[in-house]
Amino acid sequence: MSKIHTDLKKIDPITVQVVLGSLENVAVEMGHKLARMSYSSIIRESEDFGCALVDVRGQQLCESSHSTPLQSGPIPGYIKGIREIMEDRNDTFNQGDVIMHNSPYHGASHGPDVGFCIPVFYKDELIGFSVTTAHHLDIGSSTPGSCGIVDAVDAYAEGLQFKAIKVYDQGVKNRYVWDILKDNIRAPKLVVGDMEAQIAAARIGAQRYIEIIEKYGLDTVQAASEELMNYSEKMMRDAIKKLPDGEYTAEGFLDGYLDSDDPAKKDLRINVTVKVDGSDLTVDLTGTSPQVTDKPINMPLLGTVDIAIYLTLRSILLDSTVYGNFPQNSGLIRPIKIVAPKGTLCNPIFPAPTIARFNSGNAVADTLMKALAQVVPHQVSAGVGNLQVVAFSGQSNENYWVYMDIMEGSYGGRYGKDGMDAVDTLYANTRNNPIEDIESHYPLRVNRYELRDNDSAPGKWRGGIGSIREVSFLADGSFSVEADGHKYAPWGFDDGQDGYVGSLSIRDNETNELVQLPSKLPNRHAQSGSTIQLVGPCGGGYGNPLEREPEKVLSDYLDGFITKEKALVEYGVTITDSEEIDYEKTNELRKV
């Protein structure tokens, strides 16, 4: 069993809290400034970015509350990868350096999530790093966009690889790196603008960190930071101690490539065993399917798999509705160990591609939650509906336009609450993009955006409802899709029913024929007037549907979420022609 790290020096709790507030404010300011300065909607609207301060040992001190955990969480891994590469080169950190990094085999979550790292010096001593990460619209992969690259055959087909590249060396801009970048990506104005916003936000973080140290002293800030990490570690250990010692196993499945003739590329197993030993917890992924060598649904162990596990454990064992706000730092992960055999989906071997790893990581989180449901049933939800991520693109005046959209998933029901409808799920929390923003910037028309009709999974607490979005092309273009959950429905829990699968289709302008498409769709041409429809999965139900309050069943009917027939058959609730509950008939039905 590992032990809690000792403090650098004794420090009073009031000072610790003051330093905590100061650090958290820095991360918030970084995130706010990054969102305000960015060009692309995936950052300024969807907030698919991360900001954090990291100490000299690579431990995360704070993270931006405005960012997605899948961006902020991997930042220590970015630092670890950068240091390893620089040590191999015999390179050093210097004042004025800005380092660009996106290698998924060196800590990055995947190639499009480009990080910018600024080493922070105080009195000529390296004391830490200020880091921003963000998802970029294009990094020069084989087809337009940075999602839906589902046919990448290896890491090289996924786009440019930046392995600890100094874009500023001791304050001097390396113009040649920027020239190479601009010449090898689509939509360079947007991408480079976003990158410059990241650098500016990271510089703000570095400056504010130094200001905190100048105000309170380096020893005080370091001691307070260690105390905060010890506190977070203790919170996690105390939560783990409440679990019975033992092993808890669950399995889940990914669609994979349902249109493939190769059985090794579809129906892919995710196997999770949780091992509890006192205040230590191990997540063992042995039994997970082998890596898919020439398809990019493999997951980097460091940057995706670890973050899916850490964030799921944090949200389940330290639910913020119970514990309130507490320090988000590297102390939380000290009690947790991850085992993932090499050569599997969860620990691929280079150069296996990884760019389309999002839904795979979400499946790891979902299966981990399923395993924990055996011991903390009141702290988990039923199965979640995965996301559909779409890249739209086209050409105008010899230039590319590229737009990325995140089609929401849905949560399963949980003890005491219905599942959340049409939201990002589990290890991410990005926001949707306003329709007005889409239609004012791109030749696209959103014809329909609403919740699915009559498809909520029955349960004492029903599953969340997925959304439907129909988008028409106003000019010739193309699109690609990275999705899952078109075959395997989200699981129901404790007599709750399974959710509903998603779907993808296109109605071509010329033939007017509706064509069903697979969940992994490589770049496909779309003529002007063609319309695509994305239907998001619905989360699983929790608990026996016959125990659902009749008033909630009526409310769902009035909202259009279920039909009278479903209310009767699934919930045993009779709704009259005057849209009221017939309690006598309902009670009789439920007795049967």
From Swiss-Prot:
User: What's the Enzyme Commission number for this chain?
Assistant: 3.5.2.-
What GO molecular function annotations does the UniProt record carry, in alphabetical order?
5-oxoprolinase (ATP-hydrolyzing) activity; hydrolase activity, acting on carbon-nitrogen (but not peptide) bonds
Keywords of the record, alphabetical order, are: Amino-acid biosynthesis, Hydrolase, Plasmid
Q: Name one GO biological process term.
A: amino acid biosynthetic process
Membrane spanning stretches: none
User: Which Cys-Cys disulfides exist here?
Assistant: none
Question: Which superkingdom is the protein from?
Answer: Bacteria
Say yes or no: keyword Hydrolase present: yes
Q: Name one Pfam family in it.
A: Hydantoinase_B
Q: State the coiled-coil residue ranges.
A: none
The GO cellular component terms are: cytosol
Q: Which InterPro entries match?
A: Hydantoinase_B (IPR003692), Oxoprolinase-like (IPR045079)
Q: What does this protein do?
A: Involved in the asymmetric conversion of racemic 5-substituted hydantoins to the corresponding L-amino acids. HyuA and HyuB are both required for the conversion of D- and L-5-substituted hydantoins to corresponding N-carbamoyl-D- and N-carbamoyl-L-amino acids, respectively.
Subunit structure and binding partners = May form a complex with HyuA.
Indicate the family of this protein. Belongs to the HyuB family.
Query: What name does the UniProt record give this protein?
Result: Putative D-/L-hydantoinase subunit B
Q: Which organism is it from?
A: Pseudomonas sp. (strain NS671)
Gene (name only): hyuB
